[in-house]
Curated annotation (Swiss-Prot):
One of its GO terms (biological process) is protein catabolic process. It is found in: Cytoplasm. Gene3D superfamilies: Leucyl/phenylalanyl-tRNA-protein transferase, C-terminal domain, Leucyl/phenylalanyl-tRNA-protein transferase, N-terminal domain. GO terms for molecular function: leucyl-tRNA--protein transferase activity. Pfam families: Leu_Phe_trans. The gene is aat. This is Leucyl/phenylalanyl-tRNA--protein transferase. Its main location: cytoplasm.
Length: 226
């Protein structure tokens, strides 16, 4: 049975209560209060819903993750990085990045990054929890991504690209930065060919929960310097 959250209770049900179909649906309702969002990621779930739906909270099994030491950079991408076609920055324009991620795409019907979602994550950014990666070409924003940093874990949310390899360059730059700071895992949530080509793989929900328990409160071992 699906758990419905109240606006005053920030506790989520155990992850093993998530539905098998649809895979990983854990709870519905509640709100996008910053405290609830932080509690969700610490617990191992995330919001994902369309306009007109209640807020839906997910913890899929398996979970797609990337371990920084397993990052795969293809020859063509390595060449692109060496050519320095792009400038990559952190936290220069979070709002522009999340708005670009929310923009309609040819292969998708609508967007799950609703206006309330954008405002909620912008608030997390102001609190130093959510971060953006911007990829620039000739002073134009051509790619980027955003996510949350907690302890030695990074929770990726969405990325976009307006130029060939732009989002990949931003992602690789972020992963290398996180690796140098001692991060142990990047949560990619759901599988895509794009992410698998960069080294992401699936682990069980239980294994993901173990990483959460161990690393969500550990400070980075290196200079994060976002």
């Amino acid at each position: 049975m699906l758990t419905w959250l109240s606006r005053t209770d920030f506790d989520f049900p155990p992850l093993d209560k998530a539905l098998q179909e649809p895979n990983g649906l854990l709870a519905a309702g509640g709100d996008l209060n910053p405290q609830r969002l932080v509690a969700a990621y610490r617990h191992g779930c995330f919001p994902w819903y369309q306009d007109g739906q209640p807020i839906l909270w997910w913890s899929p099994d398996p979970r797609t993750v990337l371990f920084p030491d397993e990052l795969h950079v293809s020859r063509s991408l390595a060449k692109c990085l060496r050519q320095q076609r792009f400038e990559v920055t952190f936290n220069r324009d979070f709002r522009a990045v999340i708005q670009a991620c929310a923009a309609p795409r040819d292969y998708a019907d609508g967007t799950w990054i609703t206006t309330p979602m954008q405002l909620a994550y912008q608030e997390l950014h102001l609190r130093g929890i959510a971060h953006s990666v911007e990829v620039w070409q000739e002073r134009q924003l051509v790619g980027g991504l955003y996510g949350l940093a907690m302890g030695r874990l990074f929770f990726g949310e969405s990325m976009f690209s307006r130029a060939d390899n732009a989002s990949k360059v931003g992602f690789v730059t972020l992963v290398r930065h996180l690796r140098d700071a001692g991060f142990v895992l990047i949560d990619c949530q759901m599988p895509t060919r794009h992410l698998h080509s960069l080294g992401a793989r699936a682990i069980s929900r239980g294994e993901f929960a173990d990483y959460l328990q161990r690393y969500r409160d550990q400070p980075p071992t290196g200079d994060l310097d976002f």
